[in-house]
């Protein structure tokens, strides 16, 4: 996505987008260092690396946690359910790490496309240095805490973590290094018009089916 970009489906709900203009993946799922479903991305633009690369709100969201033992993590939760890349329709939560000068504070609200941070090298004191990058982890639902990764302590990811490519579409992101994952573009499948529940539910199974299809779009 690019700065200021918004993508709203015909039902009025936002489409979740990958937060950088260029994708250059440096560590994928179940990497050798610490990850299960989180990924690392370095900044990239016009054929060269970008340090302190900007990234944007993938959907309208609120910062619900800020802090983090030198990692400078920031956790955001979507304001409403959003259309997800696997066809789902859900509230999403995500965490970003390593911004040396984070701009988001707990309680701050951002509209889809707003600047929310930059890639960086922030790490706890006494630990090995890292290269400039964005650490990104996405989860279903609201913030539900942390769960240990398969690497064990001190490595954790968001509880209810998902594949990033199942949550975020890559519309208007240039895929430089994408790891071969199943990234998807939202091509405008139109959600059905929401069904108005009648006063007398003569055919409740019909209403249920329509709601399910609406959620899946």
Regions found by a protein language model. Name each.
Residues 1-16, 45, 49-50, 56, ...:
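Acidic, glycine-rich catalytic/binding loops that coordinate metals and/or anionic ligands
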Residues 10, 15-26, 88:
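Conserved catalytic-core segment of clan PA serine endopeptidases
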Residues 20-59:
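Short glycine/threonine/proline-enriched tight-turn/helix- or strand-capping micro-motif at secondary-structure
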Residues 26, 42, 97, 111, ...:
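Residue-level detector of conserved, well-ordered beta-strand and adjacent loop positions
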Residues 30, 79-80, 139-141:
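Solvent-exposed coil/turn segments that connect beta secondary-structure elements
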Residues 50-52, 56-103, 120-135:
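Zn2+-dependent peptidoglycan hydrolase active-site motif and core
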Residues 61, 107-119:
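A structural signal for short beta-strand/turn segments enriched in small hydrophobics and glycine
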């Amino acid at each position: 996505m690019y700065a200021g970009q918004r993508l709203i489906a015909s039902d009025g709900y936002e489409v979740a987008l990958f937060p950088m203009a260029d994708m250059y993946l440096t560590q994928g799922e179940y990497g050798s260092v610490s990850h299960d479903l989180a990924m690392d991305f370095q900044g990239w633009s016009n054929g060269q690396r970008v340090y302190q690369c900007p990234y944007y709100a993938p959907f309208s969201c609120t910062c619900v946690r800020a802090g983090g033992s030198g990692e400078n993590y920031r956790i955001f939760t979507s304001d409403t359910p959003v259309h997800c890349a696997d066809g789902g329709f859900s509230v999403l939560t995500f965490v970003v790490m390593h911004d040396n000068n984070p701009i988001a504070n707990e309680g701050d609200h951002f509209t889809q496309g707003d600047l929310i941070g930059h890639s960086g090298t922030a790490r706890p004191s006494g630990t090995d240095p890292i290269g400039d990058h964005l650490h990104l982890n996405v989860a279903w639902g609201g913030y539900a805490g942390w769960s240990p990764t398969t690497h064990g302590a001190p490595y954790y990811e968001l509880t209810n973590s998902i594949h990033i490519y199942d949550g975020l579409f890559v519309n208007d992101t240039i895929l430089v290094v994408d790891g071969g994952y199943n990234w998807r573009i939202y091509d405008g499948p139109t959600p059905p018009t929401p069904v108005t529940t009648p006063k007398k539910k003569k055919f409740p199974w019909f209403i249920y089916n329509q709601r399910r299809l609406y959620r899946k779009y």
